[in-house]
Amino acid sequence: MERWEKINAVQRMQDYINKHINSPITLSDLAKAAGYSQYHSARIFRELTGKSPFEYLRALRLSKAALRLRDSRAKVIDVAFDFVFDSHEGFTRAFTKQFGIPPKKYSEDPKPIKLFMPSRIRDYYLTMQKGETDMSEKKDTKTVFVQVVERPARKLILKRGIKADNYFDYC
């Protein structure tokens, strides 16, 4: 299987997840979107994204739920059911495990948390192919210290030689 075929298949799965984020998604649905078997779809998804499809889906749903809790005055139970969690207890456990703060406390006092914001896999590989690097990649940096020293302006004394046949006659 060619690399770009894998990338396009994972991109189709990402698009399907983004389109159906608020409805139940099965591995069978993702496999149909990718056009491969369930096993192969899950394998290439993990290979290219570093997460299984359901780890990816859960992290994405929790991050979108955190944004909704932060930006609106929605109840925790409503947000939990909107993002396809079976109960608010399960949602609270998952939210607390992911972000280290309960959703109720986060909605009352939103502190900065690390949200899962995945990039489109196709765009990522296109930029990698072009040779562009991410700002998060560390490059070898060299530090240069500069010290400004102010000195008085110099004056020039120029004395031209009257008779000289070579350079050393001037000395």
Predicted segment positions?
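Residue-identity detector for glutamine
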Residues: 3, 11-14, 38, 98, ...
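A solvent-exposed interaction/effector surface
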Residues: 63, 70, 89, 93-171
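Short, well-ordered helical secondary-structure segments
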Residues: 12, 44, 49, 72, ...
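Basic/polar phosphate-binding segments, predominantly the helix-turn-helix DNA-binding elements
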Residues: 1-2, 24-57, 80-102
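Terminal helix-turn-helix DNA-binding modules in bacterial transcription factors
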Residues: 7, 11-27, 47-82, 109-131
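Charge-dense, low-complexity intrinsically disordered segments
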Residues: 4, 28, 165-169
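Extreme N-terminus of proteins, especially the signal/transit-peptide cleavage junction
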Residues: 1-8, 141
